[in-house]
Amino acid sequence: MSDTTKLEQDYYGKEGKKYLSNSDIWALLKDPESFKKDKDPTLPMLQGSYFHTAMLEPHLLDDFTIVDASTRSTKVYKEALLNSPELTNMFLLQKEKDSLDEMVRVMRGNLTFFELIYASGNTYEQVGVKNIGGEMWKGKADIITSEQIIDLKTTTSIEDFKYSAYKYNYDSQAWIYNQLFGKPMIFIVIEKNTYRMGLFTCSEEFLDRGKEKVGRALDVYQKFFGGSATEDINQFFINENL
C-alpha cells in the first residue's frame, strides 16, 4: 500500500499526524507548544465541514447530526449531546443547517462557479504528499481541474477576505498546494448572511508570502520537533520588532 493510499484512509488520524500540513502553520509560528495536540472543533470549523461536504460529497451529509433547537443552551440540545454516541462537543442547529444549505444553493446557482466546480474530469478531495524543505507535507485539495486547484471558502466579509487570507494562512496553503499538485490555486468564496460571492486568484506576492511562512514554520519544527531537534520547546518565545 502506497503512502498516499494509507494517508487517504487515515488523513486526520495517526497516519496523518506523521505529516506536516498547512493547518500546522499557525501553531508552529504562534504557539508551538500546541503543535499536533488535539483540539475541539469550533463552530466555524463544523460549518465549514458541512458546507464542503454539501458542495462536494453530499452523499456523506448523513454523517452530520442536526438538532432542532433555538440555541445550544436549551434542554433539547444538551440532551442530544448526552445521548449521542459521537465523540463531539458540538452539533449544528437546524437554523444553521438551513443557512448553509442556502449558501450551497446560491453557489451552485452561479453558472460560472458551477461550471468550474463540477466540470467533467475534475477530481475532488484528492490527497497529495511531498517532501518540502526536508520534511513530508500533506494536503487535500477540494477540487482539481485540468488547469488549477479550486478551494472553497466561507467568509464574514468579501471585502475583508484579502486580510482573512493572510490571517488564516491561505497564502501558505496556496503555496504548499502548488508544490503538492503542481497547479495554481484559486479561491471561490461566499459571504455568510448575504451570500455575496467572489473569485480570488493568487499573486506572486501572495505566494511569496506563503512560501516565507512555510520556511519559518519549518525552522521552528526542525528546531523543536524534528529528528535532529536542538532546543527544548519550553524555551520558545516570540521575538518581534515593534
Describe the predicted segments one by one.
Residues E57-D63, G182-M185, G226:
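Short helix-capping/linker segments at secondary-structure and domain boundaries
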